[in-house]
Amino acid sequence: MAPSHLSVREMREDEKPLVLEMLKAGVKDTENRVALHALTRPPALLLLAAASSGLRFVLASFALALLLPVFLAVAAMKLGLRARWGSLPPPGGLGGPWVAVRGSGDVCGVLALAPGSSAGDGARVTRLSVSRWHRRRGVGRRLLAFAESRARAWAGGMGEPRARLVVPVAVAAWGVAGMLEGCGYQAEGSWGCMGYTLVREFSKEL
């Protein structure tokens, strides 16, 4: 499917369940890889080993003492990712959420935006997900182009001296990172845990 066969419009109320499932599926595709990346860093391994050693004095089962800290850490990380990216955001100053729709009416992607935390920060993508059945068909690029146009219009309406768009990407989402770099975005920051990156932020001056 070529990008020209796509349109982007605001999400309708009856599309909420479908869009929510799409967001959850998108998070599920990356959460295991993010958890594996985070929990195999040396500081995380040291903390897990210390927790397991402590639990051995409390629990009768060596296997349970070994696995329980890992299970709890993975569960906490997955819940955090789902809360951040796997739910519908509240309506923001930039409108939306928006959906990408095929000519047949099938919803194949979702996008949400929010203003930056301070003046000059530009706009931020808070949700960007494409149905697994429609990936590598230009849907992500079409949504990104729409996000850029909204960010420009919002910056002009707010009297901002420049338009800028920031897109956070989970460290394991190599496909999204490659798409952004191909569209002129540059990695400018990151955040994570214990000094290790879990999410990179890409930005572009529009």
Curated annotation (Swiss-Prot):
It comes from the Eukaryota. It is an enzyme of class 2 (transferase). Probable acetyltransferase. The keyword Cell cycle does not apply. The keyword Cytoplasm does not apply. Residues 55-206 form the N-acetyltransferase domain. It is found in: Membrane. Its main location: membrane. Keywords: Activator, Acyltransferase, DNA-binding, Membrane, Transcription, Transcription regulation, Transferase, Transmembrane, Transmembrane helix. One of its GO terms (molecular function) is DNA binding. It is a single-pass membrane protein. InterPro entries: Acyl_CoA_acyltransferase, GNAT_dom, NAT_camello-type. Its EC number is 2.3.1.-. This is Probable N-acetyltransferase 14. One of its GO terms (cellular component) is membrane. Gene3D superfamilies: 3.40.630.30. The chain crosses the membrane at residues 57-77. Pfam families: Acetyltransf_1. Belongs to the camello family.
